[in-house]
Each structure stands twice: as structure tokens, then as C-alpha cells.
From Swiss-Prot:
Belongs to the class-II aminoacyl-tRNA synthetase family. EpmA subfamily. With EpmB is involved in the beta-lysylation step of the post-translational modification of translation elongation factor P (EF-P). Catalyzes the ATP-dependent activation of (R)-beta-lysine produced by EpmB, forming a lysyl-adenylate, from which the beta-lysyl moiety is then transferred to the epsilon-amino group of a conserved specific lysine residue in EF-P. This is Elongation factor P--(R)-beta-lysine ligase. ATP binds at residues 100-102, 109, 244-245, 300. GO terms for biological process: lysyl-tRNA aminoacylation. PROSITE patterns: AA_TRNA_LIGASE_II. The lineage of its organism: Bacteria, Pseudomonadati, Pseudomonadota, Gammaproteobacteria, Enterobacterales. The gene is epmA. Homodimer. It catalyses: D-beta-lysine + L-lysyl-[protein] + ATP = N(6)-((3R)-3,6-diaminohexanoyl)-L-lysyl-[protein] + AMP + diphosphate + H(+). One of its GO terms (molecular function) is ATP binding. Its EC number is 6.3.2.-. Keywords: ATP-binding, Ligase, Nucleotide-binding. It comes from Klebsiella pneumoniae (strain 342). Substrate binds at residues 76-78, 118, 251.
Amino acid sequence: MSETATWQPSAPIPNLLKRAAVMAEIRRFFTDRGVLEVETPCMSQATVTDIHLFPFETRFVGPGHSQGLNLYLMTSPEYHMKRLLAAGCGPVFQLCRSFRNEEMGRHHNPEFTMLEWYRPCYDMYRLINEVDDLLQQVLECQPAESLSYQQAFQRHLDIDPLSADKTQLREVAAKLDLSNIADTEEDRDTLLQLLFTMGVEPHIGKDRPTFIYHFPATQASLAQISPEDHRVAERFEVYYKGIELANGFHELTDAREQRLRFEQDNRKRAARGLPQQPIDNNLLAALEAGLPDCSGVALGVDRVVMLALGAESIGEVIAFTVDRA
């Protein structure tokens, strides 16, 4: 590509018109259901502790902060939205920019648009149904199918992910020609994620969206543990045509348990030589004050627009990708 061409948008103008229509349809969906649209900060003094997420960091120098105040671009609006929920705002949604300092490719740009929403009094299954309704309305696709994480592994890899040990997981990885990665990996959840990405994802959601629910409890993140089966978390993801679209939880409301999970993440980060991340004490205070029982989900809008257009890469639906920003 010549330098003179980089001033032009990444996406064709007709694609941007379709993008605007998708955004309008999303807003209509929530307005019709009485869900409040909110805006929360793009920067925070705290960030995520997840070992797989890498936030952008910046520094504010101004009145009262002559030595500088460390700030992080938000990887998701989740923490601020939960503070609004604890303050009594009721059901909310947000369309916003999120930022992740990681790979760039067909489905990734460091700056992207996220739809996130929270539903008080919804369990995981009721929110799954609402995500399905949204996808049908925006993409005009068939109703989704649902599989538990365990069912998906048993169907496509003939192994039980909830009981298999690391040796058994490595044996399955060998059948997928992944021994060069798996044989040196000591973290069981990383092995599971490798097998899910390479051995399960390619086979699901081909003709209609597929929800995968009840991830292992060790991958709960900010989700509650299932009261029926303590081996699994009330967490789900949805896939369609080779793309991960959304990640949702029946949200954890226990501040003490959430702090323990943040601290555990930071221990894992230390073991991998990654920097320790500041824990969001404002979120923990909101949980202490009382987060209502709720379920929430984050959905990648750019990826939905890709599917609506049949686009092959995220660059076809974003005005300016990072290499042209």
C-alpha cells in the first residue's frame, strides 16, 4: 500500500452506512425494551487483572497530580456499569469504545466498539435468550443452539473437560498437532482454552449462532459458580460463523470472593512475569454496598457488523484501523 493511500478510510463508505444502521437497530432494540443507555469513563485508575488482557496505560499530569496519575484505558465498561447498578440505575446498556493492547488481525483492532448490557433479576438463561433475540433482529439469522462447555468437548474432542487431567488434555492436543505448545504448558485452564480454540470453535456456530455455557469454575472471571454443580460457572459465550461474538455472566455479587479472584489473577500474573495490576476498590465497594442480582454480557459490535455484511476482516467495517489512525 502506498503512503498516499493511508489517508483513506479502511472501510468502504457503503459499509459505514450499514454500520450506522446496525448501531441504530441495536439502540432501537433496547429502547423498545425500556433499557437505559449510559456513558461511563474510557479511563480509570484501576484495570482488569485477567492474565489474558493487556490494557493501555497513560498518565495524567494536572492540578493536584503534579507527579502524575496513572490511568488505564478501559478494556470494557463493566466495572463502571456495575457501580451504576449498585447505585440503583436499573437495566442499562452502553455502546462504547474499548481498548486492548494485544494482537491485531482479521477479528481484532486495539480500539473497538463494544455493546455491554446488564439485566437485574435475569439469570444466565434468560439473558442468553435476550442475546439470541438481538442477533435474530440485527442479523436476521436462525434461532441459536446451546451446548454446555462439557457437551461441546465431549461432542468434538471426546473428552470431559471437567474431569480430565493435564496428561489427558495433552494427549488430545497431540491428536490436533499441538504438542509443541501443550507439552510445555503447566496451566490446566490454558490447555483447555487451547483445545477449545483449536478443537471446538471451528465446529460450532456454522449455520446459526451457538451458545456455550457453564465454563469451568476455574474460568469464572466475574461470574457466579453454579449452585447445582460447583465445577462450573454461570458464564456463557456465543459463536457464529467462526467468530466469537459475546461473553456473558450471571454476575458475581460477593465482594470478598471478587477480591480473592483479583488477587489470584495477580498471583498468576506474577508467575508469568506479567505486571501486577491495581485492584478496582471502587468496584469492590459497590459490591459491598449491594450489587443487585443480575446478568450481563459484552458483545463485539464490529464483529456483528462484519457478519451483517459478510465481511472477511474487521478493517472492512471500521472507518480507520490502527494502522491508518
